[in-house]
Amino acid sequence: MMAKSSFFSLMATLATAAALSFSCSTTRVLEEGQYRLASNKVEVIGNSKFNTKKVESYIKQKPNSYIIFGWNPFLNLYNWSGRNPDKAINRFIRSIGTAPVVYQPSQVEASIENINRHLEYLGYYGSDVRSDIEVKGRKVNVTYSITLGKRFRIGDITYSVPDGEFKEDFLADTSATTVRSGDYLSEDTLEKETERCASAMRRKGYFGFTKNYFSFEADTLNSPDTAGLLMMVKEYTRNQTPEYARPHRKYTLGEVSISYDKDLRFNDKVLRNMCTLHPGDQYDENEVNTTYSRLSALRMFSGVNVSLNPRDSGIVDCDINLTRSRMQGFKVNLEGSTNSTGLIGISPQLNYYHKNIFHGAQWLNLGFLGNFQFKYDDRSVKSNEFGVSAGLSFPEFLGLPNSIFKGPSVPRTEINASYNYQNRPEYTRNMI
């Protein structure tokens, strides 16, 4: 009876707390003249297909989030406190609750500017964004109404690129461009294209070439609905002046060095197999990323840092610094159990690992487990289980040359063996 009484008392307490939470105002702690921002809404006039989520993140001030059916218990809890923040009880209640978001008109104006800028970035020029403020008691609901601006289709695309080998390589890459005549013009599209193109040029040997060398001109005077596009590649970045201009040139790899902790015993041949960067090769950003991925995949190093240092002579040196991780360790686990028949069980487990057992990134895993069950009042009822497992993993495909595996992933050959002994009242068996 006592257990039932405690249960009903607990349920009554929870029900009372929930009722108080629902009934408590969410604006009780607001000062005179303050309002709680209850909601934001975005609507696009005349275009139901536009995804409003594209601009919702650009609203500066967000209302309190709701957890259950438009209810936030932590917001209600915060409003249980009094207005005097110096009282200990009020400070405690506020520390576990959530303060109401106080509506700020200046944030609405800033949000309108933010949304307008982002719409222009998406290619909607001359958009109109307005706000409608609805006040209900001490709460404010803000609606942002958007009339989308004009969009232009891309007409002819022309290029202005420095002459020489760079121009040949650049124009050869335009077959893979993501900006084509007939597409909608937007800064978003052009930005993505410059990132793609800059990456492609770095793969062709142009170390240090970035999207900041690009600029664009759009001509909308000759047609009301289309824009002629001029893509320019300069020899100085957007933040520089012409006197800083330098010809774009291909780089060759110079010295390639690999360093790691001196106390780590390791076969350098394994590292050379993992590294796809070689002195005299043309610089290729893909190979840098591949080397980083392959060295990280060894799981021997907590840090892999690839540093590229250009020289004035068109050569870039590569310094690879490896920070070792913990090479070996133990994991111990012990579990206990009982069941309805009165059996008591103890299950110990021990695992040992070594990441560099033969000094070539070979992983060794050893596991030992047991499961012992018995009855406390009847020692004749018992069962025992013991198991051991061993695994060895090599960072190569045994029997095949490493030269045929050139991608970022590292092939592995795994050898596993296990033994399990079970002694139960019904049977005794060994499993390998």
Where are these regions (language model features)?
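Bacterial N-terminal signal peptides that target proteins for export
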Residues: 2-11
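Periplasmic polypeptide-binding modules associated with outer-membrane biogenesis and secretion
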Residues: 3, 25-338, 369, 374
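N-terminal alpha-helical segment
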Residues: 10-13, 267
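C-terminal motif of bacterial Sec signal peptides marking the signal peptidase cleavage site
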Residues: 21-23
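Gram-negative/organellar outer-membrane beta-barrel architecture
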Residues: 169, 284-432
